[in-house]
Amino acid sequence: MSLFEKVFGTHSDKELKKIYPIVDKIEALDSTMQALSDEELKAKTPEFKERLEKGETLDDLLPEAFAVVREAADRVLHMKHYRVQLIGGILLHQGRIPEMRTGEGKTLVSTLPAYLNALEGKGVHIVTVNDYLAKRDAEWMGQVHEFLGLTVGVILNSDKNDARRAAYNCDITYVTNNELGFDYLRDNMVIYKEQLVQRDLHYAIVDEVDSVLIDEARTPLIISGQSGKSTDLYKMCDYLARRMKRGTASMEISKLDAIMGTEIEEDGDYLVDEKDKQVVLTAQGVKEVEQFFHIDNFSDADNIDIQHNMIMALRAHALMFRDKDYVVKDDEVLIVDEFTGRIMPGRRFSDGLHQAIEAKENVKVKRESRTLATITFQNFFNKYKKKAGMTGTALTEEEEFREIYGMDVVVVPTNLPVQRIDHHDSIFKTKKEKLNAIVQAVVEAHDKGQPVLVGTITIDASEELSRMLTKRGIQHKVLNAKFHELEAEIVADAGQRGAVTIATNMAGRGTDIKLGEGVAELGGLKIIGTERHESRRIDNQLRGRAGRQGDPGESKFYLSLDDDLMRLFGSEKVKAVYDALKIPEGEEIQHKTISKFVEKAQMKIESNNFAIRKNLMEYDQVNNDQREVIYAERRRVLDGENMRDVIFKFIQDTVESYIDKTCSADLAPSEWQIGELNQLLIPIIPMEPIELTEEEKKSGKLDKFKQRIKEEAAKVYEAKEAEFPEPEHFREIERVVLLKVIDKKWMAHLDDMTPVSYTHLTLPTILL
């Protein structure tokens, strides 16, 4: 906390002061609500709706509506909202992000603003990160809403359109972010209005909002179809990449060096920049590629596919690691989420990187997909009239939430004081020394019965630590992407006396570890982090597994100079501190200089990732502006608007365009390309072949000629229209054809735009 904040208070302090009087009003109504019968409490819902119709606002109703939900939750679930949960509910109603720690009951908090905003009858979406949570929360919290007379729906991945439509038409709908986004895209591909499933996007409450709007922000949702591209080039590039030698440069290559053409001594065939995750060919490497593919000039535009696929093949080998970035299961490459450690079925790296990894791992290389419709979560959630979110870790990304989504973060105090002790980091010179220290710490805690949760970043690290603990005779459980089926069982036991659990980031979110009998007296759950993540949020999530609802607990991170974060961001400075202190081998140091260095490195990476996400949004904004226009036009057609005048104008414009292509007022009529004009027009407008009249040959007036052809084209259209006894039948054909043409042209445009949009970033994409 800065000196300014100490003197004047934080942003959260100031905002909470404004909210406390509203909370007081809600609590003052407690005895009044308790005195109501069930029927009288239920009658409040139609009363509130009537008051809204008469001009009252949601803010006017808030204290009483929240008090009603509070009492209903007590009667139905035997759970009564604490004061801090009322604060969280008010912030959600205001379209903000309350940061509430693990175990503070965020799920119950959402019932307050969901009920209040559902009174408008326009739909409330409660967004979760997976089907399990959507179903659980709908069945659990939905009881409160149904008791009060509201309808509750849930949408699961397996649901058909009729079930989806019914769920979206409910007052409150529980749904995952992926299903929401894909339903939006599918709705903008339907041919008949009856096929639509969603209503307008009114109000969304996003659970784990930082996961959805920050971590997933770089992941475009894509509805795809198969492209006709061969996969042979990926295999050829992989063959060559295996034979190329990684080199080193004599100095770090900056953007300025590249622009100025600074000569840099280099060896090998390619260079790797681990910080920016980029690969570049050396002059020698370029020669190797030219010789292998028998091409004269690697940089020639005709060789763009070879250029691109060669870089992807090298990236697959130099920067993408099995059991860290992906796993191979059942002859398929599956992405591992860097933030959660979970396998992400159905997602593929974009830009050909996934195919390059498939070639590297010698599994079937799948064809690249063709984009039929796409949107990012950033642009999708910004379509809501109002949105809010909940999480235990949002403050570190406050600037991004405010700048991109227009939501501020307010830290909500805990219901009970936090008793967890967060120790300073311990730093070791080598990875081996660090792991030995971690194992010793686990053994000491285990000997006294204190449960331990060890958090690792990669699957490899979790398995290495598991082997070391096995050698020491320590019984333990491992939770990573390979053993995710046992997650619920493993997490349920992690707080029991003597339990030792090794987990990747999977255990960092959405899990509530309860302490077993007698564990509180032993110091509670002990959290050990085996290295710092690039994001401080992920570290905070791991810490947050301990110390829930006033429980005791402790956390500590163990680092080494071999860790990626330390190695890539100036470990020479840290080594200098280490050497100056003359630390014997195997001993740790705890030094504020190094702790500050680690935090600065994390902030630097977070800032860089924010810049990437912001850059993506700026790129996607071009697509988004165009998508808005296309989808709005599409909806006009779908809604049944009479398109006769629009199509009539299309015909007139087409005639004019083709005549301008083939005829000119500057040329004699005998030089007009009438044959070519017929070839262009007749396949589109089935009219008689065009011939110049004697008058047109003499006068050479192009405008009059245009007018005549336009009139003839109009007659063809009117004759076709007259063939239908019911004009509406013809209108329906027009609508269907027009929609199909719009879709075909839009998909072709997306094909053209894809290289512009995403080639500067290699992203996991969610494919359907």
List the predicted regions and their residue ranges:
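Conserved P-loop NTPase motor core
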Residues: 1-561, 565-582, 632
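Generic hydrophobic alpha-helical segments
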Residues: 95, 181, 637, 753, ...
